[in-house]
Design a protein with these regions (language model features):
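Anion-binding alpha/beta catalytic cores of soluble intermediary-metabolism enzymes, centered on
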Residues: 1-48, 52-235, 240-244, 249-300
Length: 300
């Protein structure tokens, strides 16, 4: 199975048990709108933590009906985030979502050594894009968490992403390790990492996927381009997951797809005790809703 559009996420989670989603500092309009919609659709059972009066005012102004939804009043932002994380640490939630709070504040609590959501795995960002010019949904990692991942980090990032894709129904996801060129160049670290990751996959050191690289972006997403360059690959032109060389390339690609290609996107942080919806402030309510669906599908 592969996803043809982000709407397929709804089919994956529909009819299953509701996931308990905790919205940290819930006094944010777009986040509340997405959460209420997912609740009405039977996907989640939300707990809203934050300033109760602000939450209710936003809901009243936007006609969000939340009667029956649990609200925990905590006006202090840092305390609200801490309470949210502790609830999940105590097995009272399946998904954590960022509301009106800075990313650094949320991650500080997530990574707390005493009551945070550490598992020993690397945290990584995973995004799904629906682009009109590509025949299926394509995943991209890591565009927001790991600045300059080394080889060990990239192995962990691939494993996080492949595990998520398999929960979405993929059997053997095809992973393209991106570089500026498709030839190994000793002066370009990304190509060296790509070659090593490909060989490790061939030797079954990285499992449950097919990895090829280095591949330039055009080879990864266009079979015609790959054939023109004489590249023989199971991955080229049929990529399910693009592994970025670093955060700068990843972040530029992410925003280029959204703003230039008008791509639809859903994203999640993987590697913690539960999936974390950590969308950008510029993301639309629809993107937040799709990210909730993705996180619900990724939740164990």
């Amino acid at each position: 199975m592969v996803l043809k559009s982000l709407s397929d996420l709804r089919n994956i989670v529909a009819g299953g048990p509701r996931k308990k989603l905790i919205l940290a500092t819930a006094q944010d309009q777009h986040s509340l709108g997405a959460v209420v919609r997912a609740w009405k659709d039977g996907i989640i059972e939300p707990i809203l933590i934050g300033d109760k009066e602000s939450i209710q005012n936003i809901c009243n102004e936007n006609n969000y009906e939340i009667s029956g939804v649990r609200i925990i009043h905590e006006p202090d932002i840092e305390m609200a985030v801490e309470m949210s994380v502790k609830l999940i640490n105590n097995k009272e939630g399946d998904v954590l979502m960022k509301g009106k709070v800075g990313t650094s504040t949320l991650l500080k609590c997530v990574l707390n050594k005493e009551w945070g959501l550490r598992t020993g795995n690397l945290l990584s960002h995973f995004a799904l894009f629906e682009v009109d010019t590509y025949p299926k949904v394509i995943a991209v990692t890591d565009v927001a968490m790991n600045i300059a991942p080394n080889l060990k980090d990239k192995i962990a990032i691939i494993n996080n992403s492949v595990n998520c894709l398999r929960r979405l129904g993929y059997n053997m996801p095809k992973v393209a390790v991106l570089g500026a060129v498709e030839m190994v160049n000793e002066n370009m670290e990304a190509t060296l990492h790509a070659a090593l990751l490909s060989k490790m996959n061939q030797r079954d050191q990285i499992k449950n996927c097919i990895i090829d690289g280095p591949l330039a972006f055009d080879n990864a997403v266009s079979l015609e381009s790959a054939r023109h360059k004489g590249i023989r690959s199971e991955v080229a032109g049929d990529t399910d997951l693009l592994l970025m060389p670093d955060i700068e390339v990843g972040n530029v690609l992410y925003k280029s797809l959204v703003f230039f290609a008008k791509a639809k996107v859903a994203s999640v942080i993987l590697g913690a005790m539960v999936p974390i919806v950590l969308t950008s402030r510029s993301d639309s309510e629809q993107a937040k809703y799709d990210s909730i669906l993705l996180s619900a599908a990724a939740s164990k």
